[in-house]
C-alpha cells in the first residue's frame, strides 16, 4: 500500500469538513479530505432556510440557493410571518452547496478521497 503523508486529515466532506479542508489548504497545509460516500452529498439529511447575509459570508454562489421574500415560522402555539420587497432569506440547495464547498477545498489544494471509511486513527 502506498504511504501518503498530510499535514491535516479531515474526516467528513460535509460543510464543516470541506470548509476546514479549504482553510487549511489555503494556509499552506497539505490536506486530505476523507468522505465515506461515493460522492459528496450523496446522502443529504438536511434542508432549510437561512439568511442570505450568512450565505454570502461563506462565499456560497447564488446558484446554490433560492431567495424567498415571504415565509412563516410556525409552532404549535404561535406563528410569525416575515415578508418584504427584498429577499433576506433563502432555501439552500444543500446538495449543490456541499459539492461547491468540497470543490472549493480541492481548488485550494486539498486532496479528496471518496468511498473511504476511517476506522482507526494512528498518531505518528
At which residue positions do the language-model features occur?
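N-terminal Rossmann-fold NAD(P) dinucleotide-binding loop
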Residues: 17-18
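A short, compositionally biased
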Residues: 65-70
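Glycine-rich FAD pyrophosphate-binding loop
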Residues: 9, 13, 22-45
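Conserved N-terminal helical subregion
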Residues: 73-124
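Extreme N-terminal starter segment of soluble prokaryotic enzymes
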Residues: 3-8
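Conserved N-terminal glycine-rich FAD pyrophosphate-binding loop of Rossmann-like flavoproteins
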Residues: 37-62
Amino acid at each position: 500500500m502506498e504511504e501518503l503523508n498530510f499535514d491535516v486529515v479531515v474526516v467528513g466532506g460535509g460543510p464543516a469538513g470541506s470548509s476546514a479542508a479549504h482553510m487549511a489548504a489555503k494556509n499552506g497545509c497539505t490536506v486530505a479530505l476523507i468522505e465515506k460516500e461515493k460522492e459528496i452529498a450523496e446522502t443529504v439529511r438536511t434542508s432549510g432556510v437561512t439568511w442570505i447575509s450568512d450565505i454570502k459570508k461563506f462565499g456560497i454562489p447564488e446558484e446554490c440557493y433560492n431567495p424567498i421574500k415571504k415565509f412563516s415560522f410556525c409552532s404549535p402555539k404561535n406563528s410569525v410571518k416575515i415578508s418584504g420587497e427584498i429577499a433576506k432569506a433563502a432555501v439552500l440547495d444543500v446538495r449543490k452547496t456541499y459539492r461547491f464547498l468540497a470543490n472549493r477545498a480541492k481548488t485550494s489544494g486539498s486532496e479528496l478521497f471518496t468511498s473511504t471509511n476511517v476506522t482507526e486513527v494512528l498518531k505518528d
